[in-house]
Every structure is written in structure tokens, then in C-alpha cells.
């Protein structure tokens, strides 16, 4: 069995999180288990890993507008100190836009966003990272349960295999910003009724529960 650890063990003074889950999109295909994914991650952080509920910004469906997501990220980023850590979990639609220079930009799509207009209505991962880079936090981990490419920047390590043994334990001690995504551009997030979760979050929760 793979083992994932989020225990503080004197590594961090405090823990902060932004957790977002969107099912009921206004202009995109609706999802079934993104909100359930978000709630399960939130509950596990609180009940097993001693995250304080007041240190978690939790946005689902109609709460997860573009402005509210940006405010939550800014609030957490400016609240965390240099001995703290930040976890950002997003479950919902992602989109990739190809740029004129051949690069790609990954976006998360808020409740009222449009996948065919990601630049105008979505939130670019670059912007999320810029906001969080203003933070003094020792460690930031982005768990993105969405499929898109164009996520990685020079100062961010990408990890794409949540089933990899001990992957969260391995990165927890590093002073770094890291991203784990459900898949690359053009792939689909897998949800199944038998799981009541996406494949990404199912594997994540199983690892955290060990």
C-alpha cells in the first residue's frame, strides 16, 4: 500500500487550505462528484490532520465564482507565515488554451466560467501561482483534480502520480511549491458511481487514510 502523510510532526507551525469543488456549472457540462470530492478532502484534513476549520476557505458550486476563488487564495496566502504550509485542492473543469508563441496556459473554470472562453472567464494557473508566491509559507501543495496542460512554471515542480508511494511524505519537508494534476490537456476526469468520487480523489483519499 502507498502511504501519504500530511501530519505536521513539528515541520509546520500552522496549516492553511483552499478547497474548491464545482458540480453545477452554468455554461459547462455538469459534474457529479466534485463537491463530494471537496467535502471529503476538507473532512479528512480537519478530522485526521488537525487542520483548523477557520484556516480553511471552502467554496462549492455557487460560492465558487471567479472573484471568490481569487479572494480565498489571496486571504490564505497573506495569512500564512514562513513556518506554515498551504494546500490548495480544486475539483472541477480545467481548460487549456494554446498561445501564439506555442506555449499553453492551464485554467480552472469557476461556476460561471465558460470552457470556450477560458482567458475571459477562467482563472489561469499562472495567476494562482503568482498570488501564492506572495506568501511567506514554507510549502505549498496544489492538488488539481482537473485535466489540462500548461500548468507548470519554472519554479514549480510537477508531480502527476498520486498513487506513487509516499509522494506527499516525500515533498512535505521541502521548501517548495508543487502541483499534482489528474491528467494532461485533452484528457477527461474520470468519475464513477461505484466510487462516488473521481479517480484522482479516490486514490488521494485512500492514500491519506492509510
Region locations from a protein language model:
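Short, conserved active-site loop motifs that form the nucleotide-linked donor/cofactor pocket
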Residues: 15, 56, 177
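Caspase-like (clan CD) cysteine peptidase catalytic core
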Residues: 4, 14, 66-91, 95-157, ...
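Active-site-proximal C-terminal subdomain of hydrolase catalytic domains
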Residues: 21, 45, 60, 137-210
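Short beta->alpha junction loops
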Residues: 56-66
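Glycine- and acidic-residue-enriched helix-capping/strand-helix junction motifs
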Residues: 25-39, 43, 191-195
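A short, compositionally biased domain-edge/stem linker segment
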Residues: 1-8, 165
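Short glycine-rich His-centered loop
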Residues: 15-29
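Signal peptide-proximal N-terminal region
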Residues: 40-55
Amino acid at each position: 500500500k502507498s502511504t501519504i502523510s500530511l501530519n505536521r510532526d513539528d515541520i509546520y507551525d500552522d496549516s492553511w487550505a483552499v478547497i474548491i469543488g464545482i458540480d453545477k456549472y452554468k455554461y459547462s457540462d455538469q459534474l457529479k462528484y466534485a463537491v463530494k470530492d471537496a467535502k471529503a478532502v476538507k473532512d479528512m484534513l480537519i478530522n485526521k490532520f488537525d487542520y483548523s476549520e477557520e484556516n480553511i476557505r471552502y467554496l462549492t458550486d455557487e460560492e465558487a465564482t471567479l472573484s471568490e476563488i481569487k479572494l480565498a487564495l489571496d486571504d490564505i496566502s497573506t495569512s500564512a507565515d514562513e513556518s506554515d504550509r498551504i494546500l490548495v485542492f480544486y475539483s472541477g473543469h480545467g481548460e487549456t488554451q494554446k498561445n501564439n508563441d506555442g506555449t499553453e496556459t492551464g485554467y480552472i473554470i469557476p461556476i460561471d466560467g465558460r470552457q470556450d472562453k477560458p482567458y475571459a472567464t477562467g482563472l489561469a494557473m499562472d495567476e494562482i501561482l503568482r498570488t501564492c508566491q506572495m506568501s511567506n509559507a514554507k510549502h505549498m501543495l496544489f492538488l488539481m483534480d482537473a485535466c489540462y496542460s500548461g500548468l507548470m512554471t519554472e519554479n514549480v515542480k510537477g508531480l502527476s502520480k498520486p498513487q506513487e508511494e509516499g509522494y506527499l511524505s516525500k515533498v512535505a519537508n521541502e521548501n517548495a511549491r508543487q502541483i499534482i494534476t489528474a491528467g494532461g490537456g485533452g484528457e477527461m476526469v474520470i468519475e464513477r458511481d461505484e466510487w462516488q468520487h473521481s479517480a484522482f480523489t479516490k486514490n488521494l483519499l485512500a492514500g491519506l487514510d492509510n
